């Protein structure tokens, strides 16, 4: 087996792709990037089958079949082929050899076994994101809009057809419920963080930007005053700023607090020491609380947006010992996986039965039965049977040993993001996601699930991802605040 997508540079790849696209008459009628999609798949049959299913195995098989039907022909072929061409494979795998001992990789790679079972520390999440951005830059992965690092703010509106608007709004409401449940300590009945007012937010922004003396006279009175939720108002304001403006807010706030401490020390003759110490203690505690709230909120807001699909997809094979020589066998396995639905057990059996060592090594990376926390917290470097779909879209939509076979179709979940969101063509992305949600509702208790796969896809569409190969870590704003119209 050998990789037939031979291209070391963007120019060489463009030559290969132009011939391939013309030969297969790829189109972008319903998809952002050109694909084999000629029509929008209808999934009603799977909903009816789900209503009649009596076992979890049946339900899992039906949903897997629906996913493959929904995504079989909609993969972004150009980006999939670029992710799998000889040059990208060589550079993508070699990067981990060169950087495995760097600060941005070692903190999570060396602790992989721990991350399979435990909630990751914040530094392991941040290091992963920095590593993903570095990988993209060093490998030269970006060749256009659909392989880019997104930096814009979340849109204010998301337009959908009237036929699915109720479903999409229901999904968004459930996402908000889950976010609140996480933020409020796992209880739907716990006090909720209310909306943060503009005056409150503006004051916290000024405080974080260096106006530390504002701490003596906040608009709500005492600096350490708590809101209805029980959290200090300074903490909720800073946490909200992190949602809106990014994690740099906390670094700025930390510096402002240090300046405040220095000022109090230098002017000790001018302040009441007991009151000053109480104020400083409260500000420090508010900072710690804001960090915790921001982490909890981000865990929901970024459950998938912060999984860099192609970066993790290169990490797992590298970890399993895959080389450019054995890579074609991985691509072929994933292509077949996307043609025939397999549940968790059948997939693992197929990996175990492969004569190639990487199959068993991938199984050893799985965390399906080991992670006991809410799966929304699982580190994006950890592999599960569900995350095999990340590998699938990266390397399985276009089998490198026979790229022409891509015309047969191979369905992988994240390909949904390639469907257009434009209302001129009926927002097929939202329509497919809505259908998948209806299928899940027909067979599962949605409220009891840690992660609802269809909601996860909607979340990524709402934050602006129009391709599985985009990185959304730097996007500002909260997708759950978007207005569905």
UniProtKB/Swiss-Prot annotation:
Entry comment on modification after translation: Cleaved at the DQVD motif by host CASP3/caspase 3 in mammalian cells at 48 hours postinfection giving rise to cleavage products of about 30 kDa and 22 kDa that remain associated. Only the monomeric form is cleaved. Little or no cleavage in tick cells. Caspase cleavage reduces the viral polymerase activity. Caspase cleavage is not required for productive infection in mammalian or tick host cells.
Lineage: superkingdom: Viruses
Site residues, Cleavage by host CASP3/caspase 3: 272-273
GO cellular component, one term: helical viral capsid
Residue numbers covered by motif DQVD: 269-272
UniProt keyword list: Capsid protein, Helical capsid protein, Hydrolase, Ribonucleoprotein, RNA-binding, Viral nucleoprotein, Virion
Cofactor: Mn(2+)
Coiled coil: none
Protein localization: Virion
InterPro entries: Nairo_nucleocap (IPR003486)
GO molecular function: hydrolase activity; RNA binding
Family membership: Belongs to the nairovirus nucleocapsid protein family.
Subunit structure: Probable homooligomer; forms a double superhelical polymer. Monomer.
Designated name of the protein: Nucleoprotein
Annotated source species: Hazara virus (isolate JC280)
